[in-house]
Amino acid sequence: MTATASPSDTKGAAAPRISFVSLGCPKALVDSERILTHLRAEGYELSRRHDGADVVIVNTCGFLDSAKAESLAAIGEAMAENGRVIVTGCMGAQPEEIREKYPNLLAVTGPQAYESVVAAVHEAVPPAHDPFLDLIPPQGVKLTPRHYAYLKISEGCNNRCTFCIIPSLRGDLVSRPAGDVLREAEKLVKAGVKELLVVSQDTSAYGIDTRYASSPWQDREVRARFYDLAKELGELGAWVRLHYVYPYPHVDEVIPLMAEGKILPYLDMPLQHASPSVLKRMRRPGNQEKQLDRIRRWREICPDLAIRSTFIVGFPGETDAEFEELLDWIREARLERVGCFEYEPVRGATANDLGLLVPPEVKAERKRRFMEAQSHVSLRLQRAKVGKRLSVIIDEAGPTGARGRSKADAPEIDGSVHVTSRRPVRPGDIVTVKIERADAYDLHGIAV
């Protein structure tokens, strides 16, 4: 995900201007929004162009080498167009790698270093306080469209997956108090947000680090616990979509909330593989045979449930037989939304030492076969929706048509619903659409 801050409508000749680039995952986007909210509160304006700004901030991603390359390219572009650049984010946890290529940066900070970023901005271009510039909306600055927002409930992760370096970049799990999360969510909904996308490194582990401590919300105490938070969010009147949910046993508890319509019938659950031996090398939870049984039970409780997952092919030492286990599993699981990635060595990840690396051409072929198998599953599931009426949230609208998403589709990572409408629709509208045609990823229909 790449996001660039849009300028505000506020005018002020003395206000210093910031250009901002946000790279990486939705969690990083929330970090960017927090930094921008702080700076806007101090009177800084936002610039669409690097060459029109007093300083450029680049929030980097450092998870994969390809992400690092994208981050370094973004820094280079900012240096070429402006020259006064502050770097933050996950790649900032390895400053020597950045400084080696760009020694003249104003500052390099790691992830979650909000105060350090703001301090670096102050040093580069002090704020020009103005009572008219210092006003910001109560929901803060958002880099998403107005009708949806990411809601980060925790930081860090207690898992030690062998392919991942997130704990070394962002630390162990730190959960926000439930009351704080709910107050932020309420502000977003009051500001017009129709869809809350709950994110973290490990959403279903929420509150474990605090022993599920309670905090005040309205006239009662609410525990920092996965189910309790989901239930309370479901009372706010917006779509609530759960992301990055690990398959812990207590995930079963939220399925009835989905069946009751309290939260969306959607689970983003990164399973990564299906072969027991590969999962063991990954240090990933879950017995996939038992997981199939759980998925069946979930669908009995909530027939409309859509499960999204991601998988890695070409993990070190992955054999043909282990890959075939994965193919057999996805055919049987019939997941609604699936992504696939070729394993990419990450500096510092213990997976690099696990076994023989799978050749690039083999990884590419396995990904092709995986996505081909999943496309057949997806097409059957999508065609079953033809003739049905679905609720669709509109993302983009034109004179005679629009593009939106059903309850089974998250922004940017899932498919779309292409809508023909005889009446005007706007982004953020939730309309009923009769589905007339389907392909493997998108649906087509008419607003009714």
From Swiss-Prot:
Listed SUPFAM superfamilies: Radical SAM enzymes (SSF102114)
Keyword Transmembrane among record annotations: no
Domain TRAM: 383-448
Record-listed E.C. numbers: 2.8.4.4
Cofactor binding, note field: Binds 2 [4Fe-4S] clusters. One cluster is coordinated with 3 cysteines and an exchangeable S-adenosyl-L-methionine.
GO molecular function: 4 iron, 4 sulfur cluster binding; aspartic acid methylthiotransferase activity; metal ion binding; protein methylthiotransferase activity
Localization, UniProt: Cytoplasm
Annotated keywords: 4Fe-4S, Cytoplasm, Iron, Iron-sulfur, Metal-binding, S-adenosyl-L-methionine, Transferase
Residue numbers binding [4Fe-4S] cluster 1: 25, 61, 90
GO biological process, one term: tRNA modification
Residues covered by the MTTase N-terminal domain: 16-126
Gene3D superfamilies reported for this sequence: Methylthiotransferase, N-terminal domain (3.40.50.12160), Nucleic acid-binding proteins (2.40.50.140), tm_1862 like domain (3.80.30.20)
S-adenosyl-L-methionine is among the record's keywords: yes
Enzyme class name: transferase
InterPro entries hit by this protein: Elp3/MiaA/NifB-like_rSAM, Methylthiotransferase, Methylthiotransferase_CS, Methylthiotransferase_N, Methylthiotransferase_N_sf, NA-bd_OB-fold, Ribosomal_uS12_MeSTrfase_RimO, rSAM
Domain of life: Bacteria
PANTHER family per record: RIBOSOMAL PROTEIN S12 METHYLTHIOTRANSFERASE RIMO, RIBOSOMAL PROTEIN US12 METHYLTHIOTRANSFERASE RIMO
Function per UniProt: Catalyzes the methylthiolation of an aspartic acid residue of ribosomal protein uS12.
Family listed: Belongs to the methylthiotransferase family. RimO subfamily.
Entry-linked HAMAP family: MTTase_RimO (MF_01865)
Protein name: Ribosomal protein uS12 methylthiotransferase RimO
Organism field: Methylorubrum extorquens (strain PA1) (Methylobacterium extorquens)
